[in-house]
Amino acid sequence: MDYKSTLNLPKTDFAMQAGLPKREPVMLEKWYEDKVYETVLEKNDGKPLYVLHDGPPYANGDIHLGTALNKTLKDFIVRYKNMSGFKAPYVPGWDTHGLPTELKARKKAGVSNSTAISDIELRKLCREFALGYLDEQRNSFKRLGGIGEWDNPYVTLRKEFEAKQIEIFSEMATKGLIYKGLKPVYWCPECETALAEAEIEYAEDPCHSIYVKFRVTDDKGLLTPMGADLSKTYFVIWTTTTWTLPANVAICVGPEFEYALVKSGDEYYVMATALTESAMQAAGKTDYEILGTLKGSDLEYMKTAHPFIDRTSLVIVGDHVTLESGTGCVHTAPGHGVEDYDVCHNHYPEIPIVVPVDSHGKMTEEAGQFAGLTTEEANKAIAQHLEDTGALFALQKIIHQYPHCWRCKKPVLFRATEQWFCSVDAIKDQAIEAIKGVKWIPGWGEDRISSMVRDRNDWCISRQRRWGVPIPIFYCKDCGEPLIEKDAMHAVSELFRAEGSDAWYIKEAEEILPAGTKCKKCGCTSFTKERDIMDVWFDSGVTHAAVCDTRDYLHWPADLYLEGADQYRGWFQSSLLTSIAWRGKAPYKAVVTHGWVVDGQGRKMSKSLGNGILPQEIVDKYGADILRLWVASSDYHADIRLSLIHISEPTRRS
């Protein structure tokens, strides 16, 4: 018997299932038709302004779960503030310049050799590529349910943005904070450009740690009285970058450390007393004796012979020397190390800077018999030569953390080249003081960024590429003197505001510069233009000025920056440095960071593991609200686990 007709059951037209993948696009379309975002802001007119400044993603690929997490958290805050007595506009932004975009654009266009096309043709390819991905990402972010000024975002390639960027550069340059110098920088031989610290990723790398003997040629009369035979007396250095040995010009010791003269067989070695046992063990030498000791400062200005190049390596002192590993006698190549460069440049200006490696990562003629080899080939060849000539003291295989290029993932070099720098030292104390006035969430963020700023070197802001904002510097045709003048840079800013930065590659210097511009050094009136572009971290580092300070419905400084924890060394820091240089204070009142999205087992998502999940997969199958629910229920300060089980569970329960 059918009892259905006898039961008084409730009836409703309300769907038993949410059907989010189909219903959400309809709801979103109605939001935009009804101008919900604009209506909310209009309703909040007259209320206190709250500005969350959006960190710009790169417009060169599809969005991933990390960006989905980030944009959703921002949307929660913007909505909450608009419902809590504030007027909270949201201006999304995009970072559009840089090497990754250039390489992907060239690949898409089938241009394998960038020199095969003109500057303007290359820049056109890159612009179209970036704007295409900007549209795709914008649609993806809108599909996630985010409200904001999607039709009027800030974009780093727009004329008004580039003009403001030149203004900030000009302010910094005229304050003496921008300079050109020959200094060791991270250099990617694959991409053939300098890199900033924020563009470096560390990975484990197998290598050889090598101990090398440098024969003493002048002991200042201190070692022979202890019984040393100078013809058989050596300083023993230690390094993990064998290829830099052709650049060695000095041996650095700690001035306050104790150094021993060690006899083993018929040879004599100078090394730190505290490291003698480990060094002799590495060489397999068990029968040895210490004949005497000296302070490091006593060794200063002793001389040694380079083991395979006809050159003297001077013994110098430096406070950067440690007794953590090696021999306490530091191989010093100022052309390939920041600390080496600093100690030589500041205290031993007579020591030459030798850079026997070219932009492709190959040894030059200055490397002697190793010329033409790659650095990897040179590692093996030099070690073999040292062994053959008796200059090898010991060699061990180790695995260490080594810097790699963020783009090509290959090992980078430290290499001295002429680059443009921002003087961080000049503003470091002011920046650290400003950090104290910012609210950091989590609280440990303050210590983290403070230590990073305290320890960082001057910021290399030049790149040897063509897709980016040109460095607005001119050079005298006669004497080569750089022209760093406010009027000249103002002319560039106004040109970019009117025509965009492509004009730099179209117009001659004389068409850009104010009439009557002369070289201050020689009076010449003819100039050439700088070929390098600015680091993309400088682009994003000035967004606080180009957006928050420029749009009259926002304010500066921003109330909040919210990004992943990797931005302590990236956007948070570049924004802070440009802001301190420009206005002497931080560009944000509060900074919040979130963790990474990892798989259900806590592993990083990657193609090799096959554990990656695209936001679009979740949205298409379950709906954006389910993804938003996952974000809302997660502790975003730590790494967040995600699997399809995490996503499907709320759907099943509903």
Where is each model-derived feature located?
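N-terminal catalytic cores of NTP/NDP-binding nucleotidyl/phosphoryl-transfer enzymes
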Residues: 42-104, 237-246, 315-343, 347, ...
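Histidine-rich, glycine-flanked metal-binding segment
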Residues: 17-47, 280-285
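Alpha-helical recognition segments enriched in aromatics with Gly/Pro capping
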Residues: 218, 347-360, 465-467, 486-639
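Residue patterns forming the tRNA-binding/recognition surfaces of aminoacyl-tRNA synthetases
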Residues: 2-13, 17-20, 26, 30-34, ...
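Structured, non-catalytic alpha/beta "coupling" segments that mediate domain-domain communication
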Residues: 89, 246-292, 393-424, 648, ...
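Aromatic- and glycine-enriched glycan-recognition loops and surfaces
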Residues: 69-72, 373-377, 513
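Protease-associated
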Residues: 250, 257-329, 338-342
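Short, solvent-exposed turn/loop segments enriched in Gly/Ser/Thr/Pro and often Arg
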Residues: 44-47, 55-56, 89-102, 153-161, ...
